[in-house]
Curated annotation (Swiss-Prot):
Residues 217-378 form the TrmE-type G domain. This is tRNA modification GTPase MnmE. The keyword Acetylation does not apply. Keywords: Cytoplasm, GTP-binding, Hydrolase, Magnesium, Metal-binding, Nucleotide-binding, Potassium, tRNA processing. Belongs to the TRAFAC class TrmE-Era-EngA-EngB-Septin-like GTPase superfamily. TrmE GTPase family. (6S)-5-formyl-5,6,7,8-tetrahydrofolate binds at R24, E81, K121, K455. One of its GO terms (molecular function) is GTPase activity. Its cofactor is K(+). The keyword Nucleotide-binding applies. The gene is mnmE. Coiled coil: none annotated. K(+) binds at N227, T246, I248, T251. Disulfide bonds: none annotated. Mg(2+) binds at S231, T252.
Length: 455
């Protein structure tokens, strides 16, 4: 356990007006704060109603006080929580009062969670889950974040790490004792155990990818020529009139954003200005912003007005658009206005892109598009027992998988035990970065400073 010598204070509840506001204090002087503000020692882990006083004994507020001595607290240190009235002025007066006590400072963003991590109250993935739970934008995301906080993700990682450790011991024993009559590397155990670890890792990667989608969502840009129905599609997907829709080409001049959920999957929809030769400076800026959004998208919905062309292949519809589209960008062709053309609604493939025929105006075919977007991201929607994951987690899992693949190739091709042992060690290190067992101070700083103050 790493007990800090300084004591920190911050408001744990969100800033602004509320019925209740909570001040959190953590560190060796938490008990001194209770004596100074309340005037007496508090019984550990009991809620006590008391007045909160300034240095002159004048009452600032009154509320509930709770004291948690180390190590049985959120941070693993002595912790005091003062639950008062949630007005910003009241909270500010209480914090200023506490800061007048020597040896107490304002907490940095995420410092309470950081201390909990450093004091082994939780691992790094669990600490990150606190922020994810607070930021959850759907019920499904909240459940996944809570699972991570309860250790579902960490337990899977720890199981993989333990398996790697046992396999490393076996492989290194085979290297260190070559005089043994049994060829440990050729007896099939190492190969079988390694394949089992790879299979389990791939299963965790699949779950983690779902968790990352749940956290970060999918950025979809609707692009195409003016008056193709882009704004109508934005309204149809979001279920509200976010964008102005008229028969006048070029009505949308700037980027419009809407955030929705499809069976729990966050979807960031972006409607852009119609792409054409700009008629004025305002339109030119809007078109450039449209291309900027396209460059950052996970997928582009290429809108086509079905009443203007019978073509379905984007190479025939607008080759210049494809030429400027970023390489490897996922694209779906949307033939709009099926209510006017009489085309059959549905999904099919034209060369590589998927083609969807729909009517953004009537909403026919839009459900097929929603299901298509889930499939594009590999989102199952079934997150019972799932966990939240971040991009850094996916990167660590990917690196671990790469090194296990290299080790497997060396084992099967050359019986290279030394190289296999090294690849196992590196894979173990990458997995341990997820829970924080092997993590640089720089990474810890970047993770915890992204938290709210008071968390």
């Amino acid at each position: 356990m790493t007990l800090h010598t300084d004591t920190i204070v911050a408001q744990a509840t969100a800033p602004g007006r509320g019925g209740v506001g909570i001040i959190r204090v953590s560190g060796p002087k938490a008990k001194d704060v209770a004596l100074a503000v309340i005037g007496k020692e508090l019984k550990p882990r009991y809620a006590e109603y008391a007045p909160f006083k300034d240095e002159n004994g004048l009452e600032l507020d009154q509320g509930i006080a709770l004291y948690f001595p180390n190590p049985h607290s959120f941070t693993g240190e002595d912790v005091l929580e003062l639950q008062g009235h949630g007005g910003p002025v009241v909270m500010d007066m209480l914090i200023k009062r506490i800061l007048k006590i020597d040896g107490i400072r304002t907490a940095r963003p995420g410092e309470f969670s950081e201390r909990a991590f450093l004091n082994d109250k939780m691992d790094l993935a669990q600490a990150e889950a606190i922020a994810d739970l607070i930021d959850a934008s759907s019920e499904e995301a909240a459940k996944s974040a809570l699972n991570s906080l309860q250790g579902v993700f960490s337990n899977k990682i720890n199981t993989l790490v333990e398996s790697l450790i046992y396999l490393r011991i076996y492989v290194e024993a085979a290297i260190d004792f070559p005089e043994e009559e049994i060829d440990f590397l050729a007896d099939g155990k190492v190969s079988g155990d390694l394949q089992g670890i790879i299979d389990n890792l791939n299963a965790v990667r699949k779950e983690a990818n779902q968790g990352a989608i749940m956290r970060e969502g999918m950025k979809v840009v609707i692009a195409g020529r003016p008056n193709a129905g882009k704004s109508s599609l934005l309204n149809a997907l979001s279920g509200k009139d976010t964008a102005i829709v008229t028969d006048i080409a070029g009505t949308t001049r700037d980027v419009l954003r809407e955030h929705i959920h499809i069976d729990g999957m966050p979807l960031h929809i972006i409607d852009t200005a119609g792409l054409r030769e700009a008629s004025d400076e305002v339109e030119r800026i809007g078109i450039e912003r449209a291309w900027d959004e396209i460059a950052q998208a996970d997928r582009v919905l290429f809108m086509v007005d079905g009443t203007t062309t019978d073509a379905t292949d984007p190479k025939l519809i607008w080759p210049e658009f494809l030429d400027r589209l970023p390489k490897n960008m996922g694209m779906t062709v949307i033939r709009n206005k099926a209510d006017q053309t009489g085309e059959d609604l549905g999904i099919c493939h034209v060369n590589d892109p998927t083609l969807i025929r729909l009517s953004a105006k009537t909403g026919e075919g839009v459900d097929a598009l929603r299901n298509h977007l889930k499939e594009c991201m590999g989102f199952s929607g079934n997150q019972e027992g799932g966990f939240m994951a971040r991009r850094r987690h996916l990167e660590a899992l990917e690196k671990a998988a790469q090194h296990l693949d290299i080790g497997q190739q060396q084992l099967e091709g050359y019986m290279a035990g030394e190289i296999l042992a090294e690849e196992l060690r590196i894979a173990q290190q990458h997995l341990s970065e997820i829970t924080g067992e092997f993590t640089s101070d720089d990474l810890l700083g970047r993770i915890f400073t992204s938290f709210c103050i008071g968390k």
